Amino acid sequence: MASSIKTVILFLLPLLLAYSVLAAPDITDGGDKPGPEIDDGGGDKPVPGNNDGASDYAKPAFEPEFMGAWVIDNPNAGVAAMQLQLMPNDQIVWFDTTSLGASGYKLPEGTPCPINPDANNQPDCYAHGIAYDWKTSKYRPLTLQGDAWCSSGNLWPNGNLMATGGTFSGDKAIRVIANDDPKGDFTTKIGALADTRWYSSNQVLPDGSSVVLGGRDSYSYEIVPPQMEFKPKRFDLPFMQQTTEPPLGPGRPVENNLYPFLFLLPDGNIFLFANNRAITFEPATGKTVKEFPVLPGGSRNYPPSGSAALFPLKLTADNAPVIPEIVICGGNQPNAYELVDARHVTEKQFLPALQDCNRIQPMAADAAWIPEQNMPSPRTMGDLIHLANGDMLMLNGAKKGTSGWEDATEANLTPVLYTPYKPMGQRFKELTPTTIARMYHSCSALLPDTRVLVAGSNMHQFYTFDTEFPTELRVEKFSPPYLDPALETERTQIDPANTDAVLKYGKPFKITAALMEKQPLVLGEVKVTLLYPPFTTHGFSQNQRMIVPAITSVQNGVITAVAPPSGQIAPPGYYIMFVSHLGIPGAGIWVHID
C-alpha cells in the first residue's frame, strides 16, 4: 500500500510544481515584487539545443551563496582602456586615442619619442597603448601610428590582433600585433581600408577573414583577410544610412547606430542590429536575407549604447541544427544624446537609461522580439560578457545619460549575474558592487583563470583627475559567484599535457581533467565551454562567441567531446577552453580550432 501511495505522489509532484510555476505572477524588475504581465521572454521552456541551461547537467548545479569580490590588480596602468583585447599569449592589449594629449604613462627616460601626425607632427613622449600581463600585473608600452580613437578589431586565426580604423590619419588604418612575440609592437598600414572606419564593428567570418562594418558617415562594409597586404573592396550598405538619426546625410552628430551589433549566424549570414532595427545579410554579396520587426523602447547603439550578446551555441554529437538566440539590453531614448551633448544644449538633461532586455532567434521562420525580464537597474555603456560556466555578466556603465564626454551620470556600480535559462523573475542577480565608476571608455574581459578583468573609464576629452568621475587608471579583477571559496573542492583542473590543444572541425577531442582533490569527473556532471575572446569597446564585445561542444564520454578522468562542425559555428582561431563541474568552472587553457 505504501508503495502505491509513493507512486501516486511521485506522479502528481511534477504536475503540482508545473501548476505552481504557471500560477506564479510574472516578475519584471529583477526583484521580489510582482510586475505587470508581459511576454515570458523566451519562456520557461528553452528551445532544445539553444539556451537550455537546465539540461547542462543530470543533477542540480551548485547555487553559490558567494556574491563576488573585487580586488585592485594594479593601482596605475597609465593608459585608460578605450579598446581592449585578450590575446592567446596571455597579454591584454588596450589602447586609447593619440590625438588628445598626454596619457598617464610617460615613456621611460631615453626612449625615443615618436612623431605623432595627429598632434601637429610633434614628438609624443607618452604611451597611448599597453600590453598588460594579467598574470603578473606588469605592462609595457605600445606604439600607435594613426589615431585609433574609437576603432574596432578582432583576432586573426593565428592569434594576431588586428585593430581597424579610428580617426584622422588612422581612419583607414590597420594595426597588427603578433601573438607569437611577447615583446612585439604594432605594425601599421595607413590607408589600407576601403572606407573610413570611426565607430565601426568587426565580425570574424568562417574563413578567418572579418567584416568591418559601419562607422561615422560610412554606410558600407568591407571584408578584410587575415594579412597585411590586400586589395580593399567596399560594399554599399544602405541599411546603415536608413538607421541613422537624423537621416539627413553626412556630418550629423547624433546617429544612434554607431558600433552596430554584429553576429555570425550558423547559416553563414550576419545578423546586424543598428539603432532599433535589424537585418541579416550575406557577407559575400551584401544581399539582405531577412528584415526583422523594429525593437521598441529606444535606441540601442552608440551613443545611447546598450549591450548585446549571442547566447552560447550548444552542439550535439549528431550535429542537430543549432538555434542561435541574441539578447539586447539597455540603451536610452532616441533623443537622449541631444539632451546631454554640448553641441546641442547648454544645460544637460540626463534621461534614465533603458532597463529592458529583449531576445530574438533570428533564424526562426517567425523571428520576433520577445521581452526578457527587466534588468535590476537601468544601464547604458555596460558590458555583457560570457562567464566560464556559460552564464553571463553585466557590469560597468551608467544609469543616466549616454556615451560621450560628460554625457552620463550615476555610475552603475553593481554587476549582475544573468542566467537566461532560469524562470522569469530569477534570471538576474545583483552581485557585490565595485567602488570605482566604470563609465564611458571602460572595458572588461573574462580571463583564463575565470575571473573578470576591468579597466578604463574616461568621461572627459583629456585625462582629468579632479572631478566626480575621474579618468580611471586602476585595474580591477572581479571574482564571480562560482569562485565561492566554499566550493573550491568542486573546481576542475585540466591537465594540459594530456589534453588536445588543437581541435579539428567535427572530430572528437580529449580533455584530461579532475576535481581539485583529484576526484574523478562523471558524465552528466561536466560541461565544456569554448570562448572566442572578444574585442571590447563602448559596451559591445565584438566577436564574442561561446561554444558548448557535445560530450560523448567521461572515463578514467578523460572527457571526450566533439569539436564544432565548421567555421560557421566556430570561426578558426584560438579559444579558451573551460571545464565546469555542476556549474563550477576551473581555470581554462588555450586551444586552437580549425
UniProtKB/Swiss-Prot annotation:
GO terms for cellular component: cytoplasm. Keywords: Allergen, Cytoplasm, Glycoprotein, Oxidoreductase, Signal. Residues 28-56 are annotated as: Disordered. InterPro entries: Gal_Oxase/kelch_b-propeller, Gal_Oxidase_central_sf, Glyoxal_oxidase_N, GO-like_E_set, Ig-like_fold, Ig_E-set. Its EC number is 1.2.3.1. Gene3D superfamilies: Galactose oxidase/kelch, beta-propeller (2.130.10.80), Immunoglobulins (2.60.40.10). It catalyses: an aldehyde + O2 + H2O = a carboxylate + H2O2 + H(+). The N-terminus is blocked. It holds the Pfam family GO-like_E_set. Its main location: cytoplasm. It is found in: Cytoplasm. Residues 1-23 form the signal peptide. Expressed in pollen (at protein level). Coiled coil: none annotated. SUPFAM superfamilies: E set domains, Galactose oxidase, central domain. GO terms for molecular function: aldehyde oxidase activity. It comes from the Eukaryota. Catalyzes the oxidation of aldehydes to the corresponding carboxylate by coupling the reaction to the reduction of dioxygen to hydrogen peroxide. Substrates include glyoxal and other aldehydes. Does not have enzymatic activity on D-galactose. This is Putative aldehyde oxidase Art an 7. It comes from Artemisia annua.
